[in-house]
């Protein structure tokens, strides 16, 4: 086996606090066969909660996947014991023998017909050929998947799957040599942390939370609050009066500069107002909330709760699907300038090739254009997509193609 990158041979942190077993299933590595170097398998810390479980960088690991050269072979009555070396270490692998039906199949009392005898003999010859071709000896490359366990105070792998690797030009070994450093970099060397502590750390890490992070965190908390309370519409100032949200928005933030970090406090009401405004803007971009009229002092509507919007969009799709040869008119910015110090934008409706078809239905952009022109509401594409998904879940409409919808 080629020598692995030395930077990837990281040891499991012995000082890291063990994550409660309740959260192990949240780590994808827990259910996977972890492709680790043998050196790391031998040095993993064993769990104090569940025997037979091990930790690498906080990742709970029980099953592993290794590939290496066989350096020793011991045959027992029911299993083989292979010593496998991947150039980082050597580990013993217990590989159970496949059950043989030679004795039972050769019993003449069982084989009643010549056809059965012929079939059995052919299967026996095939089995013998497979065993000869796949017989594993010293120097062969073997791949083993199995469970890590302790036997006589030594760590070994109890195989569930194992096979000889036919790799005369080292294609599979080189591919694995390139794969493992990437897995270590993207998965195994990224510590798995207790999910229950993430929220608390985010709230308590005032020295490291920047303005963008605070805005994103506040938007998530606002979203959770609206969902929990089943709010249909609200004003921004109403959210600013909610104590947990206000406390979060008023915490200190860190602004990075070229040479150092300067801590600024959002004590002023205007700063809190600005953070809430930015957080709601994020929710608008994601389509979770919308406004019928622009302005932070205007009423916000929760997209999933506004039945009036759902009904209007459904009616637009239902009516326009019955109008063949109808082309979509999309608002396009035609001129931008200033008048008396104020920005002025002139928009014109232009015909774009997005027809309404009786079979395919209405295009998403056609529906959005109808809402903007007829209702004059401040909607974006994300809001419309949220509504279309809700209507489709309720079986009111169906998607007939790429961004095309029709109503029942």
From Swiss-Prot:
Signal peptide: none annotated. Coiled coil: none annotated. GO terms for molecular function: single-stranded DNA binding; single-stranded telomeric DNA binding; telomeric DNA binding. The keyword DNA-binding applies. Transmembrane segments: none annotated. Pfam families: Stn1 (PF10451), STN1_2 (PF09170). SUPFAM superfamilies: Nucleic acid-binding proteins (SSF50249), Winged helix' DNA-binding domain (SSF46785). Keywords: Chromosome, DNA-binding, Nucleus, Telomere. The keyword Nucleus applies. It is found in: Nucleus; Chromosome, Telomere. Belongs to the STN1 family. Component of the CST complex proposed to act as a specialized replication factor promoting DNA replication under conditions of replication stress or natural replication barriers such as the telomere duplex. The CST complex binds single-stranded DNA with high affinity in a sequence-independent manner, while isolated subunits bind DNA with low affinity by themselves. Initially the CST complex has been proposed to protect telomeres from DNA degradation. However, the CST complex has been shown to be involved in several aspects of telomere replication. This is CST complex subunit STN1. It comes from Rattus norvegicus.
